UniProtKB/Swiss-Prot annotation:
One of its GO terms (molecular function) is dGTPase activity. It comes from the Bacteria. It comes from Rickettsia bellii (strain OSU 85-389). Belongs to the dGTPase family. Type 2 subfamily. Keywords: Hydrolase. PROSITE patterns: HD. The keyword Transmembrane helix does not apply. NCBIfam families: dGTP_triPase (TIGR01353), PRK01286.1-1 (NF002326), PRK01286.1-5 (NF002330). Coiled coil: none annotated. This is Deoxyguanosinetriphosphate triphosphohydrolase-like protein. Pfam families: HD (PF01966), HD_assoc (PF13286). GO terms for biological process: dGTP catabolic process. Residues 62-198 form the HD domain.
Amino acid sequence: MLASYASDPLKSRGRLYREIPTSYRNEFERDRDRIIHTNAFRRLQYKTQVFINHEGDHYRNRLTHSLEVSTVARSIANTLNLSSDLAETIALAHDLGHTPFGHAGERALNECMKEHNGFSHNAQSLKILTLLEKRYAAYRGVNLTWEVLEGIVKHNGPISGEVNEYIEEYNSQNDLELNTYASAEAQIAALADDISYISHDLEDSIGAKIIDFNNLAELKYIDQHVFELKSKYKNISSSCLIYEVVRKLMHELITDLLWQTKTNINKEKITHIDEIRNLNYQIVDFTEKTNERIKEIKKFLHERVYKSNRITAISLKCTKIVQGLFKVYMEDVNLLPVNWKIQIDSNNPNSKARIIADYIAGMTDRFAIQEYNQLCSLNFNNI
């Protein structure tokens, strides 16, 4: 049974374009299915999480990461008597707007767009779901419920100060109440993302031999798990050891989050979802001690993994590809597919750059590499 402060699909604020409900799925389940059926969701399979797709078959990509986040979010929401369908749906959609080549690709595209209001993967997720996906005759986008769109835009908290151009444009026709917190389910999706990526980036980095267990000794909290597991299982393999470490880490993070969130709900005497939205802090959270540990792990990953020579070298190549593609398309829009070129508004000075950014952002790693080799390489064998 859902808690009184949960997002109830029967009480949804609805969709921008009214639709008749179905008898066999609630509104959030329907949204989940629509997201899974988008082209953007399928493309996540060939988009970088940390390691480029061709580096190995067992490294996580944006799709496997999104699936893992959704399972964590669903479990947490279930335990708290919140809408697991909404938490799962927001988690599945949270990375739809990512460029090829992960954060390196996003930084490169944002740099290309600095004179055209920049690029944000969060805003791009909204744009994909409300404009760029073309699956239905009656409207553009996939016409998701207000709660899902709110969660995608605000899962990291209220939006204040300068608002992204597309978020502001969409918000003018469907007010997402940008100055408030999102639902507890959206907050769960955001922290499920943190739990998943710090755990699994550690696992993948050990597997890729970017770091080893000696490096993990820098994280006393993690090193203690390593010591205990080695003591218990004398002949444990490295692959099994890191899996067990990550398993323990995820369990402890989830357990901690559940305890602190229940404590917050009880302290604030929460009885309605609007009380969650109007609080002056995030209701779903870790304990202070665990937040500090998470910061340590993120710092470790940043210094030891994301800034490693191997990842840095790959990132430089990826940056060159994204910026190279942007440059050639800006110089000659006839290189764009016709269905993209015709969308350019000659009366809008930002239109060309924005359409090109949308096109590049939707590329998979391998398609971006292929396009770059075709359009930017001096190797005439590519012609």
